[in-house]
Amino acid sequence: KEVVHIHAQDKVGTAQAGKMDMDEYNGLISNSWGICGACTSMTTANSMCMVAEALGMTLPGNSSMSAVSSQIRLLSYQAGKQIMNLVKENITARKIMTVDAIKNAIKLDMAVAASSNLILHIPAIAHEAGYDLPWWKYFDEASNEIPLLSHLAPGGPNSIKEFDLAGGMRAMLKELLPRLNGDCLTVTGHTLRENVEDAENYNHDVIRSLDNPVMTEPGIGVLYGNLAPEGAIIKIAAVPHGLWRFKGNARVFDSLHDGLDALRAGQIHPGDAIILRYMGLKGRFGTTAFTFQEELKGLPELYNSCAIITDGRFSGGTSGLSVGYTSPEAALGGPLALVK
């Protein structure tokens, strides 16, 4: 099994709790961090690279290539030449990043269980392009249409390197093409369909087809309920199956630091529903609960039995029963502010 950086991050809590030899932990760190470039798992950086390709804004195959490969060196040269062609043909970003292209990116998000933070970044891109539409609605619709086609770390067993060797984003987009708008223009000057028509899938265990998905549920889900009348986001592909149904007592913290203090003091118990609130965009600039989630993951008796619910966000590499972006956030009087 390939060791990637997320495996070292998952052991932070274990090491801090004294349940792992520090020499062993340092060895794991030394051998799990890859070369320069984006992370080796499905975190926000890789997610945004894949979104850029699904939008049509990169040359085909760019998003999963190694940062120091001969492939990327050749592609960078080709990109420079293609920019000049785009200028000559008057093909601009606004002609490429259409509403349909953005919807393609959202569907790709579901198929690869990309970062939950795309709920921020994709609407921000759309806003800059002049499309102020109900993007949460489109995420919700896509979550009911697109199954998980690739189970990448942290939720699954495969790395980005394995994804690339299987055929990368071109193979993924070809498998997903029946659910996409293949007529969208891309920076090649050709359509998305034309870009992937000759793509090969070299490993059908890593990149699945629509007829044989990893699971019929999407990688990312939009949740609604009495705590989130306007929605919340969860990375379904990274939730242990034993936690797909959950009931627990609320443990409420009004800041990340209070929650971490309680966790480190042994005051969090198996089965708790941990509420981390006032961490949203208006309350505290969209604070990430990733540190809490990672330390919790190092304590299996808690990670495998507890839920985290926050109006803040997580790292793209989050896993476990972790619900973020709960809306309206507590600072705006959302229901999360009433939990005791």
Where are these predicted regions, by residue range?
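Catalytic or ion-coupling anion/metal-binding cores of large enzyme and transporter domains
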Residues: K1-E329, G334-K340
